[in-house]
Amino acid sequence: MALNGEYAHVAFDELRAPLNKGKWRSDVFKADAAMPLDVEVGTGNGTYFAHHAKTHSDRLLVGLELKYKPLIQSIRRAVNAGCKNAAITRFHAFNIDHLFAEGEIDNVYIHFPDPWTSPKKPKNRFVCKENLELLFRLQKPGSFINFKTDSLVYFLWAMDEIRQSPYKIIFETQDLHNSDMKDQNFETAFEKIFLREGIKINFVRLQKI
């Protein structure tokens, strides 16, 4: 497996990844302790993952992805782009506190997670009050979370959860591509599909004050 072979130095399975907790900068990236460390929850095929790593070479990036094929696609894109600041792990985001120590991470990106729209499935949604409280402890003050989804049902539900969390809402829209944030936005592969189908993109930015 590439997780323990070709990409072993930048791709970690469920057993190896927690060993980096509190030590991602020093042990994985050999970077200065002050260098920002961002996290993408659910990298998909890695278009945003590689873009972020390449355009923000002054920041580190760790991706979380459960599915093996997109995980490898993601790290391969970053490596092929010459990025030395990206790593990825096959790990369930609900257990993200097993990967990072309190105050270890900076910005968090959550793009188009499964909306779990079945009436019995909201408990599986990652953006919820409990996980936001968890992320709040892991992030440095001043850091933000970007959350994008095509599902208005999930977005409205998540906004209720967000308002019960410690985060401050910096920007919120139900139509990202007709908002003041459109020029700052990078379109993911899923996003391009949704836009072609005429689906509006919901977006919120939260900040740890």
Swiss-Prot record:
GO cellular component: tRNA methyltransferase complex
UniProt keyword terms in alphabetical order: Methyltransferase, S-adenosyl-L-methionine, Transferase, tRNA processing
Positions of S-adenosyl-L-methionine binding: 40, 65, 114
Gene3D superfamilies named in the record: Vaccinia Virus protein VP39
Enzyme nomenclature, EC number: 2.1.1.33
Keyword hit for Transferase: yes
Catalytic activity: guanosine(46) in tRNA + S-adenosyl-L-methionine = N(7)-methylguanosine(46) in tRNA + S-adenosyl-L-homocysteine
GO molecular-function term, one example from the UniProt record: tRNA (guanine(46)-N7)-methyltransferase activity
Residue sites binding substrate per the record: 150, 188-191
Residues of the active site: 114
PROSITE patterns registered for this protein in UniProt: SAM_MT_TRMB (PS51625)
Keyword Cell membrane: no
Pathway it works in: tRNA modification; N(7)-methylguanine-tRNA biosynthesis
PANTHER family: 3-DEOXY-D-MANNO-OCTULOSONIC-ACID TRANSFERASE/TRNA GUANINE-N 7 - -METHYLTRANSFERASE, PENTACOTRIPEPTIDE-REPEAT REGION OF PRORP DOMAIN-CONTAINING PROTEIN
Described purpose of this protein according to its UniProt entry: Catalyzes the formation of N(7)-methylguanine at position 46 (m7G46) in tRNA.
Family: Belongs to the class I-like SAM-binding methyltransferase superfamily. TrmB family.
Protein name, per record: tRNA (guanine-N(7)-)-methyltransferase
Species the sequence originates in: Bdellovibrio bacteriovorus (strain ATCC 15356 / DSM 50701 / NCIMB 9529 / HD100)
